[in-house]
């Protein structure tokens, strides 16, 4: 994947979290929610890019990846699953939530769990951003550029 996209993504994280980049001795817990199943070919590249980007910035992170599997579940089931993701993230002491694609974005913000309102949240690869929803949440940073997955696979 394009390293420049990951660098820009990480810069947006740093703009959202002043001082986040200066505390390299701390280990941050990151919840990475992907919209589809782990068998989707590009998901390993996304995880690797996220890890590499934090590593290049000198940050120590524990990344927990959860898969929403949105092609399988109904919307109501997705919201229940997302609440479980949030519950586990809360138990781990998660510091940042990152999601990829529309399903994870929308489900996180509408599942009814307050974690998405309490932590910094970064979304990327959104095809249909909901401007009013994004604008109403000061803790949300969205990169609406599309990652050209078809060029890489």
Regions found by a protein language model. Give the residues of each.
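Short hydrophobic alpha-helices and adjacent helix-cap/hinge residues
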Residues: 2-5, 20-153
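Bacterial N-terminal signal peptides
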Residues: 8-18
């Amino acid at each position: 994947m394009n390293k420049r996209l990951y660098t820009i993504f990480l810069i947006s994280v740093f703009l959202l979290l002043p001082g986040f980049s200066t505390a390299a001795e701390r280990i941050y817990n990151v919840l990475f929610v992907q919209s589809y199943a782990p068998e989707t070919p590009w998901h390993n590249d996304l995880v690797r890019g996220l890890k590499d980007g934090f590593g290049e910035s000198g940050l120590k992170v524990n990344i927990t990846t959860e898969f929403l599997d949105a092609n399988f579940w109904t919307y109501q089931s997705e919201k229940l699953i997302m609440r479980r993701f949030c519950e586990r993230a809360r138990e781990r002491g998660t510091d940042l939530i990152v999601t990829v694609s529309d399903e994870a974005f929308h489900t996180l913000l509408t599942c009814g769990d307050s974690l998405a309102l309490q932590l910094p949240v970064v979304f990327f690869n959104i095809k249909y951003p909901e401007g009013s929803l994004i604008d109403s949440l000061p803790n949300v940073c969205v990169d609406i550029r599309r990652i050209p997955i078809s060029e890489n696979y």
